[in-house]
Amino acid sequence: MTLAFDEIQDDKIFEDLTAEYFRDLKDSPDNNITNVEVKASGEGSDGGRDILIEIDISDDIKVFKRKWVIQCKFREDSISTTHLKGINIPTLIHSYNAHGYLLVCKTRPTSGVTELFERLNEKCKDQYQYEYWNGTQFLKKILLMESLHQTFFPKYFNYVQSIKNKKK
């Protein structure tokens, strides 16, 4: 059995998983994150912002902040630019005084989206960052974050526990 999004039932749970992933980042010894503040958009139209995160990072001299606008797309098909229409991403980033925009996908973005993000990264006069995680990338990150398994992937968690118990 492998970790898969099959256990995630809908877009709200996918957003919750994404938010919890960022909340749990501060507990990881593999980074210099000292605090993470997560703000979900709530029910209704979100205008392209599902989650707003503010991360405090220490470089051993000073703590600095990074703010990201995150949009989650829990769809079976690839995410195309039509799924992002009606959102002026640079304006959205600016309106939240953020550093960048992260698109988290269940599947993957189309070449149109990846090319759009490449152009925005190269030519954005405000030097905002435009990133995406496809489903495989996000699953790899989640796999390392065992604190999320029991809540969001109970079948996978039970499978792993049964293997661990057999080894005892």
Language-model features and meaning:
Residues M1-K168:
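Mixed-charge (Asp/Glu-Lys/Arg
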